[in-house]
Amino acid sequence: MDSWSYGRSVFMSNETLLPCDTFAKNRRFEQRLSNNDDVLISDMAGNSNGFSAVSITKVVPEEEDEENISSSSKFSSQELNRIDFKLRSFLDLGNDDDDTSSRGFALPSKKSRASNLCSQNPLCQVYGCSKDLSSSKDYHKRHRVCEAHSKTSVVIVNGLEQRFCQQCSRFHFLSEFDDGKRSCRRRLAGHNERRRKPAFYFLPGKRHKLLRTSQDVVGNKFLENSSLVLPESFPGSLLYRVIDEDDHRTSRLVSFKDEPTCSMFPTNEQNSSRTYESKPAIYSTEVSSIWDLHETAASRSTRALSLLSAQSQQHLSKFPNTTFSITQPNQNLNHSSSTDYHQMEQPLWIDPGKTNSAGSSSCKGKGTSTVDLLQLSSHLQRIEQQRNYTGDVKQEYNELYFPGS
């Protein structure tokens, strides 16, 4: 305290500020601030009552100001990133804790399951067997059946009579198997369908067209499952298949054109009766479709008819007691789209010993019907007449079986 602050008048309190006091205080404040050059007293004004208002501003260089601002901004961004990182790590830790807690329930079950599999040796599941399969193949281990019971026709599994299917690799009821089969009926049907491909014959002249045999070709049967006959071996004519009736085996295919004598009538050395099955010329150089195939066979029928009539008289006189059969085409012709050109009926048995004065022989079948050679020739003539009925049908089936040709 200054000396003049003591001994004031009674009428004046110690708290009363005099102008001299304010001036002295202001001087001391200036001296205190003079030690700090950064502080500037910008405004000091006196009031009527002796008080003054002083505004103090701090003078800071611009470089330091920018560094402080950048440091404060960096600090704030670092703090924010740190806080954000802490929050994220906290959330991740929480999720990891949840995952580990959920995994903690799942992992022991897998370990226990694996330990159970390792601890227990695979055994055959057939009742009464219980064979240890640890030294068996992996296939038998996987399906829990021993090698012997995998091929057994009847076993008991789960109290029921079953059998092991080799394609399904599991046990089925006995009703699902055919007799003597090791695979179930359902799998075996699909297996046979894939394995049994339909047979095809190739007809030259139609740009590698394949023609299906047997029932698939307009329902006819004159293309049967026989061996391929090349056009070099048998150039177009009527073919006859010689069949031994004793053992029903096919011996050869002969032609009217090549061997008229040997193919039609047997010799003395041939003791067994033979069946001569009529076959059309399957392969020829001029054949281009199934209809051209028939026309080629029909055009050669007159030659076969002449050979038949010329040789019959000569050979029937030589062998009076020989019995043979010739398969003839059926005379009942159906002109609908579902029938073929000629169908084969039962072979006719011709007994050359029973001949009439006109030179024709009577033909007796396995029934009681008889047919002479004139009726036989009429059958061959009808083959030639069939071309009159092939106008619209030929065009329809050529479009059906040979499209775009």
Swiss-Prot record:
Induction: Negatively regulated by microRNAs miR156 and miR157. Transmembrane segments: none annotated. Disulfide bonds: none annotated. The keyword Kinase does not apply. Its cofactor is Zn(2+). Signal peptide: none annotated. It is found in: Nucleus. It comes from the Eukaryota. Gene3D superfamilies: Transcription factor, SBP-box domain. GO terms for biological process: defense response to bacterium; regulation of DNA-templated transcription; regulation of gene expression. A motif (Bipartite nuclear localization signal) lies at residues 181-197. PROSITE patterns: ZF_SBP (PS51141). Binds 2 Zn(2+) ions per subunit. Zn(2+) 1 binds at residues 124, 129, 146, 149. GO terms for molecular function: DNA-binding transcription factor activity; transcription cis-regulatory region binding; zinc ion binding. It holds the Pfam family SBP. Keywords: DNA-binding, Metal-binding, Nucleus, Transcription, Transcription regulation, Zinc, Zinc-finger. A zinc finger (SBP-type) spans 121-198. Zn(2+) 2 binds at residues 165, 168, 172, 184. The SBP-type zinc finger is required for the binding to DNA. Trans-acting factor that binds specifically to the consensus nucleotide sequence 5'-TNCGTACAA-3'. This is Squamosa promoter-binding-like protein 6. The lineage of its organism: Eukaryota, Viridiplantae, Streptophyta, Embryophyta, Tracheophyta.
